[in-house]
């Protein structure tokens, strides 16, 4: 018994199957199959290998070959002799009881070293039934034969038995995710993706606690709480423009000019009467519970709602924030009392 290429081979009679250590796999290259196995078998018919069995592919179906293989998980190797379809012909018989092997593609040349041709590899696919109406399967076979330097014509007559090495394996079916990827790539509108989104799992866009409340809406209760000291102390408390309502207040006296501003000031307006928003004392009052209210104020104490108000037009031209200085808010108590 001799060890060649890491595989235990038996050049005598009976073959002793040797298990490979964990982590080792029998995965020879095309050139190794030709040089270390097929050539040895052709020159010595008694040659056997621990990882390569011997089988007649015309008498065995491809799904039965793994059972008689010496070694292999996904690929199974066998020494085989070609069966001539006709005694005087050169065509190979590739039929079995259930179907036949059909060659596909072009034979591949196998070289050793720098351009030394030593063999050829043929690819075949198994079909069930009979040609030409056979049904293709996923069973594939690579058939290795000697050629070039090791051509049968260069061998003695005693070595001209047409031995080949066959590697048989089952090719996995195509993945079904390709269809899904193509379908997703064709989605180009919102109408096509509505069925892919689960809207029930999305959070609400509007806080239900603010639905149904009158007056302008703010981003949260914290902003309402921070707004109260600003209204009571307009000249000292810092103000962020995020506290301003995004929609116009429903003022009883609201003049609209060419600028389209919610406060009714034109870009070049010099008329204070046109640029004034008169706030009646019943318009807006500050409430400790709700922040803003439209309740009628019957008290005599002057509040923000009890003063007419005018804003400087420079606040609305975009160069100055509407809240950069509340000093621009001019309270006209005399106009109210008149």
Curated annotation (Swiss-Prot):
A GO cellular-component term linked to this record: nucleus
Keyword Nucleus: yes
Gene Ontology molecular-function annotations: DNA-binding transcription factor activity; transcription cis-regulatory region binding
Record-annotated DNA-binding residue ranges: 118-177
Residue ranges constituting the NAC domain according to the UniProt record: 20-171
Biological processes annotated in GO: positive regulation of chlorophyll catabolic process; positive regulation of leaf senescence
InterPro entries attached to this UniProt entry: NAC-dom, NAC_dom_sf
Gene3D superfamilies cross-referenced by the UniProt entry: NAC domain
Pfam families per UniProt: NAM (PF02365)
Subcellular location field: Nucleus
Annotated keywords: Activator, DNA-binding, Nucleus, Transcription, Transcription regulation
Complex formation: Interacts with RCD1.
Domain comment in the entry: The NAC domain includes a DNA binding domain and a dimerization domain.
Misc. remarks from the entry: Plants overexpressing NAC046 exhibit early-senescence phenotype and reduced chlorophyll content. Plants silencing NAC046 exhibit delayed-senescence phenotype and increased chlorophyll content.
Function: Transcriptional activator that acts as a positive regulator of leaf senescence. Activates NYC1, SGR1, SGR2 and PAO, which are genes involved in chlorophyll catabolic processes. Activates senescence-associated genes, such as RNS1, SAG12 and SAG13.
Stated name of the protein: NAC domain-containing protein 46
Source species: Arabidopsis thaliana (Mouse-ear cress)
Origin organism lineage: Eukaryota, Viridiplantae, Streptophyta, Embryophyta, Tracheophyta
Gene expressing this chain: NAC046
């Amino acid at each position: 018994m001799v060890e060649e290429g890491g595989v235990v081979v038996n050049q005598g009679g009976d073959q002793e199957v040797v298990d490979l250590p964990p982590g080792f796999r029998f995965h020879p290259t095309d050139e190794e199959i030709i040089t270390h196995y097929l050539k040895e078998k052709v020159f010595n018919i008694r040659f056997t290998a621990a990882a390569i069995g011997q089988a007649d592919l015309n008498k065995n179906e491809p799904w039965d070959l793994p059972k008689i293989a010496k070694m292999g998980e996904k690929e199974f190797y066998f020494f085989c002799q070609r069966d001539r379809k006709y005694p005087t012909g050169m065509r190979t018989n590739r039929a079995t009881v259930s179907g036949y092997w059909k060659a596909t593609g072009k034979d591949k040349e196998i070289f050793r070293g720098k351009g030394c041709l030593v063999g050829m590899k043929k690819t075949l696919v198994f079909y069930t039934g009979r040609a030409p109406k056979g049904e293709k399967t996923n069973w594939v076979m690579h058939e290795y034969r000697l050629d070039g330097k090791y051509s049968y014509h260069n061998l003695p007559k005693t070595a001209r038995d047409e031995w080949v090495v066959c590697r048989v394996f089952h090719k996995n079916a195509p993945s079904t995710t390709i269809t899904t990827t193509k379908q997703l790539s064709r989605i180009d509108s919102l109408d096509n993706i509505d069925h892919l989104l689960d809207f029930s799992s999305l959070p609400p866009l509007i806080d239900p606690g603010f639905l149904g409340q009158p007056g302008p809406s703010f981003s949260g209760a914290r902003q309402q709480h921070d707004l109260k000291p600003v209204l009571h102390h307009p000249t000292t408390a810092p103000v962020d423009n995020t506290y301003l309502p995004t929609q116009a207040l429903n003022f009883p006296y609201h003049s609209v000019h060419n600028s389209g501003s919610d406060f009714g000031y034109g870009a070049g307006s010099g008329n204070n009467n046109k640029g004034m928003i008169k706030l009646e004392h019943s318009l807006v009052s500050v409430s400790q519970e709700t922040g803003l209210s439209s309740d009628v104020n019957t008290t005599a104490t002057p509040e923000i709602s009890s003063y007419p108000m005018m804003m400087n037009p420079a606040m609305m031209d975009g160069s100055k924030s509407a809240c950069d200085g509340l000093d621009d808010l001019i309270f006209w108590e005399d106009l109210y009392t008149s």
